[in-house]
């Protein structure tokens, strides 16, 4: 309820007593609204009195009688306000609409949809949709009934319902509404369809995007430049760059001129695939069409070239056409330098960014912190964190996760758990990544019991573990030979519909080989194949290493041959494992032969390789001396 001052109360009374359409009942109601006690008896509330109160902005009266309003009275009042939807919206704001029945709520939404601004009705729709009390189909059907009561031809209400679902990232519900509109003969606007296509693209539901786009075409809903831009982006995501560029010709056929966004989308698509020359050709074409490249054009190219260590080429090109790096450019440069281990240059770009008047973002700091941890510069990372805190910047979930993971990777469980407690205190909820890092550090310290307890706690809170978390915990148990628990986790994964991958099976195979159960490990590879999971070079190296440690070089070489037949190239680990097996069996000549093969394949032997060969030869010499 709003509070009113004495002058405000007087104004309300005067406006009713002196205004047009004076009603004694309304005047008495206004007086009672200001002076009533729990025992006061209100006069009957009629539609006439309620409408007078609304039209004269006597909202204190509306608020006073709100809990006495029946759905029927509210509906009648709303229908009387169809031509003044702004008053209908104010009326709804002064009563508890959600105390009323679903039918009345939908009627209110339908009336308010006649406002020129879509924001009020969109907000109401979001509240109804997120309440989850009714299905989208029920909501749609009730809105159709409300729409029919208003006797209006406009179908904007249903377009807004679709857009509302898209804003809530409820893409399946948005698509359902689209087809319900089709059933009713309501044709969605192109902009509404673009909302669905955009969301499908963002969610990487590429196949669904093409099906929906085809249905748009069949329904003769015209595409505009935004539609084409979205579909060009979809093609770029698929890696179909030639087809994406071909859409420029299709746009011309439909008389739609590309915009700078069209060209920038293509440049980004080519750049993400490392097709820099193709991206440059598109830039040349856009220039010929009168478009000047901007930072959105060059930043994707800069990003790829940064990874290649060729950022200076792009910066020089940008400078030549008068483009100045923006905050996105600097963050790209900082990330590139950090990933390449050049932290000095990364911080130099940060300083240059500040000199140019740009404020470093969370992304900037998170990139630098991650880079410092990757280079084992823990103290420098802690200094940077203090700097961030001194600036009054509150750490976000990404920063906490980077820090926790950094400490976990370096085995500092104490600091990692302290940060976990701190983020909880700050009201930031830990994620799957947070708990995976903590489980990792516990397993690394052979504290698998504590890791299991943390895992059970996480699951108990309702968080569904992901594949990485399961693999991390499983690897911890495999490392200490606790294979019963490891296989029980595999069963839990099946129960939770978490599909294992090659990493899962490699962990189990490594654990079995560590226990000397080589045949079981081999059988596990068979199971892996039956489940449609392709073994990788790690799978084969694990078996080769296991057999070699046992001295079973026959089976080790058989696995190596199978590995070669499937197109996997032996690695340094493969050869070193085989050399250890030959050394164990005192097969010096074969070891020398394998060393020569290794060199011919372009694999440089390391100390371990030479030690195994020397040991094998020494054993062979000793064997010859004994004979």
UniProtKB/Swiss-Prot annotation:
Location in the cell: Mitochondrion
Cellular component terms (Gene Ontology): mitochondrion
Keywords: Mitochondrion, Repeat, Transit peptide
TM region(s), chain numbering: none
PPR repeat placement: 154-188, 189-223, 224-258, 259-293, 294-324, 326-360, 361-395, 396-430, 431-465, 466-500, 501-535, 536-570, 571-605
Transit peptide limits: 1-29
UniProt key word Nucleotide-binding: no
Similarity comment: family membership: Belongs to the PPR family. P subfamily.
PANTHER family: MEMBRANE-ASSOCIATED SALT-INDUCIBLE PROTEIN-LIKE, OS03G0201400 PROTEIN
Protein name per the record: Pentatricopeptide repeat-containing protein At2g15630, mitochondrial
Lineage, uppermost ranks: Eukaryota, Viridiplantae, Streptophyta, Embryophyta, Tracheophyta
